[in-house]
Every structure is written in C-alpha cells, then in structure tokens.
Design a protein with these regions (language model features):
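Signature of Gram-negative chaperone-usher
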Residues: 1-171
Length: 171
C-alpha cells in the first residue's frame, strides 16, 4: 500500500461567538482538523500566524488604525490562562478524538487549550500544535481562538487574523 495522509479542515473562517469583552474570555466557534494516515511514525500539525505585534500573533483592525491585540506570552511558550480586563489573544488546541489506529495523540504545551488556556501564535515560523505517535483512523483536533480586551481597546467590528494550518505524516 502506498503512503497515505488525509488532512481535513472543517472550514476556512472562524468567528468569535460574541463581541470581545472586558468582562470575559471570548472564544471563536472553532474548527476541527481530522487526520487519517498510515504513517507508522504518526503525524504532526503546525500553525503560523499572519499578523505580528512585536513578534507575536495578533488580531488586527483596519478601521481602528491597524490596532492590534497581541498575545502576552512569548511565542512557543507554554499556554496560559487569559486575564479578564487585559488584552490577550491566542490559539487553544484540544483533542476531540484519539481514534483507533495505533498512535497516541498529544498536544504541544504551547497550544494546549485545556482548562480555558491559549497559546501565543507565532508570525515568524510554523510551530507544532499537536502530533501522534503512529497511524490514525480519524484523529480529530479542535482549534479555537481566545481573546480578552482592556477598557482602552479601540472599538471596531473588523478585528481579524489569518492562520495557516498544515499537517504531514511522519513516514
């Protein structure tokens, strides 16, 4: 049998479920990535951000003078709990399904989204967000962006970001 790797992203866009708020952490509705592969050594999924605020991924508003809401920790550092009332932005990855097939799915500590945490995105390079140790028959990851804002964050309805998500089998 030839090498096989299927990587299915559930959609191209992901909106926040409500307006960003100084009173709570707001999340997007999320997207899933489904991976099926016969790669004996598993698979890896990476992410890279488009917007950059001091070398950290960011939401950006054109109507607010290109204002950015960036992550607060270093890109690649362990994920953290966002602080209500302060500006922060990041990616939270969780495991929806560790399907049968032989490999064990693991989250990279930088983007581990369990317990309402998020990791600062990196606009300078692709960073791993999750991997598995063997073949997969439908492993599913959930990708959710989370953000908090401060009282002085400029009002705008066009805060956006673009992330590139890629994956590969480890043959």
């Amino acid at each position: 049998m030839p090498p096989s790797f299927a990587f299915v992203l559930s959609g191209n866009t992901d909106a926040f479920t409500t307006n960003l708020s100084t009173a709570s952490v707001v999340s997007t509705s999320g997207r899933t990535v489904t991976i099926t592969t016969n790669a004996a050594s598993g698979w890896i999924v990476w992410v890279k951000d488009l917007n950059s605020k001091a070398g950290k991924g960011a939401l950006q508003s054109a109507t607010a003078g290109s204002y950015q809401i960036g992550g607060t920790s270093a890109a690649g550092a362990a994920s953290h709990t966002l602080t209500v009332g302060a500006e922060d932005y990041g990616l939270a990855t969780t495991i929806n399904t560790d399907a049968a097939g032989g490999g064990v799915v693991g989250l990279d500590a930088a983007y581990d989204g369990t317990a309402a945490k998020a990791g600062t995105l990196d606009p300078t390079q692709f960073r791993p967000i999750a991997s598995a140790t063997g073949t997969a028959n439908g492993d599913i990851l959930s990708l959710v962006e989370r953000s908090t804002i401060a009282g002085q964050t400029p009002a705008a309805s066009d805060y956006t970001d673009t992330m590139t998500v890629i994956g590969a089998g480890v043959f």
